[in-house]
Amino acid sequence: MAKQKIRVRYAPSPTGHLHIGNARTALFNYLFARHNKGTMVLRIEDTDQKRNVEGGSKSQMENLHWLGIDWDEGPDKGGDFGPYRQSERKDIYNKYIKQLIDEGKAYYSYKTEEELEAQREEQRAMGIAPHYTYEYEGMTADEIKQAQADAEAKGLKPVVRIHIPENRTYAWDDMVKGKVSFESDTIGGDFVIQKRDGMPTYNFAVVIDDHLMEITHVLRGDDHVANTPKQLVVYEALGWEPPKFGHMTLIINSETGKKLSKRDESVLQFIEQYRDLGYLPEAMFNFITLLGWSPVGESEIFSQRELIKSFDPKRLSKSPAAFDQKKLEWINNQYVKKADRDVLLDLALNNLQEAGLVGKEVSPEKMEWVRQLVNIYAVQMSYTKQIVDITKIFFEEAPELSDAEVEEIKKDDARPVIEEFKKQLNAIPRFTAVQVMNAIQATRRETGVKGRKLFMPIRIAATRSMVGPGIGEAIELMGKEKVNKHIDLTLKQLSDLGL
């Protein structure tokens, strides 16, 4: 017997930007499909018209592509199992709604929202978990038909509910959690499978789509666990075999230990936000993979090819995944340091232009200068937008020394070192990094000062920073006129402080 070909799906709702959690779902499905040489389907679940955002699906697809996630079938690619938008599959859903009604497994319900809420309030007052109770209890078929006709005459629009069998256990062997089960009396009563506007509910449409699209494995977030028994009710009613389910654990804020919520503004949560900051897609792909999945060994840096080769759902964690911003920055920095310099240049130049530090029209000479700036500061950048803050001194007038910089210079008698360096700097034949280092060595010989006591005062006076790339390269790019101005301002400030 031939091995069943794996088919997975990522099925977002077009309700906004691509969230980290949704990106993880797409990524794990992608890795699972590619590892097994299977098929990945993209399906747009847009039945909730009120929540849909114009351009939402296009934005999500664009950000998935940016991350390096592609799919084999979808609304933009077609395929043998389309349409791939739920809003275009209404006739398909109606066919199965009718089948269930004809078989007596589903029925029209005319209870109004006010009646349902009153029922829930009464149940709460009695200490009972709110649930729907069958509105035709004890009625004959003719009486039910008459009650429905009366409701229609009043202009009431029905929903369609599916019968939940009594005293049943719905269980599955979860790819992440292991054995999971629900009793039928905990599901909340007969639930809606078609809304008053004629659109199917999520838990009905997803079953129809997964079955007809021959989905074999469903990897999704932990928040869908409670949906699974409802979907199993539908599978059973239609006589279909369900796919294998795997529910990934929650993502929590590593600082607070609380579930990552879109209302938590302490963490950027949308892929587009990280794109705007200049994070690299390969780094984001790497980081998101580690949110709830553990590789073999200690390494944390992997190429996409390596992750596809090694991905095994058995290594998905049963514990919540901690979103650690510092770890993301560290991972991205590893990629920045080895990234193609043309890619970094494009990102950093865009950041500098958005900040108004570089004009929209850039001459070849200016472009080469920015390229060198990016090259020497790449090692410091967790993401490329940081270049705006760490290189502002190259574009703006020098600020006064900070208190920390003054304290650093005060540790030793730095004035003679700074004055001698200015003298040596203005004596070099060419203003290059090599010649700048020669000037520093000449300062060492003339003053007898070496090590940190030599380099730190020079770095602070010339570049207005206590950290940075090679001091020779930084001073060369800053230019002779600007460096001299910085040194003069430093000496004046020291004089004003009586130093």
UniProtKB/Swiss-Prot annotation:
Similarity annotation: Belongs to the class-I aminoacyl-tRNA synthetase family. Glutamate--tRNA ligase type 1 subfamily.
Q: Which residues form the signal peptide?
A: none
Q: What keywords are assigned to this protein? A: Aminoacyl-tRNA synthetase, ATP-binding, Cytoplasm, Ligase, Nucleotide-binding, Protein biosynthesis
What PANTHER family does the record tag this protein with? GLUTAMATE--TRNA LIGASE, GLUTAMATE--TRNA LIGASE, MITOCHONDRIAL-RELATED
In alphabetical order, the GO MF annotations are: ATP binding; glutamate-tRNA ligase activity; tRNA binding; zinc ion binding
Keyword Thylakoid in the entry? The reply is no
Subcellular location per UniProt equals:
Cytoplasm
Q: What is this protein called?
A: Glutamate--tRNA ligase
Name the catalysed reactions: tRNA(Glu) + L-glutamate + ATP = L-glutamyl-tRNA(Glu) + AMP + diphosphate
Chain positions of motif 'KMSKS' region: 259-263
Q: What is its EC number?
A: 6.1.1.17
Name its species: Lactobacillus gasseri (strain ATCC 33323 / DSM 20243 / BCRC 14619 / CIP 102991 / JCM 1131 / KCTC 3163 / NCIMB 11718 / NCTC 13722 / AM63)
In which broad location class does this protein mainly occur, judging by the first location in its UniProt entry?
A: cytoplasm
Major enzyme class: ligase
